[in-house]
Amino acid sequence: MSTIHDLDRLVRKGVRTKDGNDLGNIIAVDGSNMTIQGRKMLKIPSTYIDFYNGSEVFLTLDIKEAFKYKI
């Protein structure tokens, strides 16, 4: 697990919810938000990042909470 200091490093990385669901890949970072493209387009604040294992970003949100950020 690593701490993220530069959010731009996360572009093209996979994103999973705390319950293990795959949300897709980060396609853009703007300010403190990540745009994720998968089954749905989401714009999720980076404050919901739990950890990054070097290949995937894990969130503190479950799938239902994450879909509230649909764009």
Spans of features found by a protein language model:
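Peripheral interaction segments used for macromolecular assembly
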Residues: 1-71
